[in-house]
């Protein structure tokens, strides 16, 4: 949450050097993310879920994988799936919290009613784990939780990474 107006601090030389060293691995990272995204696209074909749109002339780096839940989501609503993933130990996020919901901007008089489309998106979208080294078992676990009946309880198997 943004409580007050802040500054945009620039990165240090050390951070720049680290970034440059990571560029050598960029193609590998993107390739791994594409593999993860391919599995999500294949496994999450659910009527109530809209998967990320990819134009045929563009190549995404998939820094996020956002699921957008439709009005007809029923038991697979955004909040239900979000809570089931979180309760199961999976790190799931809302991307992005609209600016008018942050205390700094709401105090300036910005209201939800001023931005109905942003509010709809916020209430329907979640980001699921997307990183190059997610294991097949971890990704399968995420998929199973999303596709499951809402009454089913999940516990993360021992040995899963703390990156969740």
Task: Label each residue range with its predicted role.
Residues 1-164:
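PLP-dependent aminotransferase class I/II
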């Amino acid at each position: 949450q943004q409580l007050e107006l802040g500054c945009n601090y620039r990165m240090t030389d050390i951070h720049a050097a680290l970034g440059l060293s990571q560029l050598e691995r960029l193609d590998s990272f993107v390739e791994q993310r594409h593999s993860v995204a391919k599995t999500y696209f294949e496994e999450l074909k659910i009527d109530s879920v809209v998967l990320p749109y990819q134009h045929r002339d563009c190549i995404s780096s998939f820094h996020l994988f956002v699921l957008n839940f439709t009005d007809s989501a029923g038991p697979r609503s955004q909040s239900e799936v979000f809570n089931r993933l979180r309760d199961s130990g999976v790190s799931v996020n809302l991307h992005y919290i609209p600016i008018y919901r942050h205390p700094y901007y709401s105090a300036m008089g910005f209201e939800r009613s001023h931005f109905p489309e942003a509010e709809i998106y916020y209430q329907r979208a979640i980001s699921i784990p997307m990183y190059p080294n997610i294991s097949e078992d971890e990704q399968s676990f995420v998929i199973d939780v999303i596709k499951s009946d809402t009454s089913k309880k999940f516990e993360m198997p021992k040995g899963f990474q703390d990156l969740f």
